[in-house]
Amino acid sequence: MRIAFTGPESSGKTTLSKWLSTELSDTIYIPEFAREYLEERKIVRASENDFRAIVKRQCSLFNQTESNAHHIFDTDIFVLRVWNDEVFKLKLPELEILPSYGMNIHFLCAPDVEWEEDSLRSAPAQSERGRLFEKYKIELRNSQVNFIILSGSLDEKKSLILSSIQDNSF
């Protein structure tokens, strides 16, 4: 099973993906490469060249497969697509290849948690995070992929994730 978390910044993607990777047996956790890349280089805002490198590496991680293992992705192609659309507006073929990444489900995290500041985040306003959340919903619907919106408390989100996986509701 390949599960990806998506949504605006500071919406719980990392918290939930790390948690889920400990809940399921035989799991490979794949972190968000952009954060690793930018923090390692002490970059606050990615340039076009940085973004291209991030896309290339993250997409190679999307193609990572190991038989019988669950793959839990802290981010997905939609995070890269929205970021590109909002900031760079580049034509990158990697951002158009949806079926080949083969995610079984995308969990769209609502921005209903308190925004946590860090050096890489740029949208503290709830209205901006809400606008981006709507953009993610449109992207997911237009791409006709399986997705479930996660909203509510952390426990409610965890419960919905587990019941969705157990019921195979995707």
Regions found by a protein language model. Name each.
Residues 1-2:
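Pre-Walker A (Motif I) flank of P-loop NTPase domains
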Residues 5:
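Hydrophobic anchor at the beta1->P-loop junction of P-loop NTPases
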Residues 9:
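The conserved Walker
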Residues 13:
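Conserved lysine of the Walker
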Residues 18-60:
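Conserved substrate/cofactor phosphate-moiety recognition/catalytic segment
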Residues 43-89:
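Conserved nucleotide-sensing/catalytic segment adjacent to the nucleotide-binding pocket
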Residues 88-156, 160, 169:
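A glycine- and Lys/Arg-enriched "phosphate-lid" helix/loop adjacent to the NTP-binding pocket
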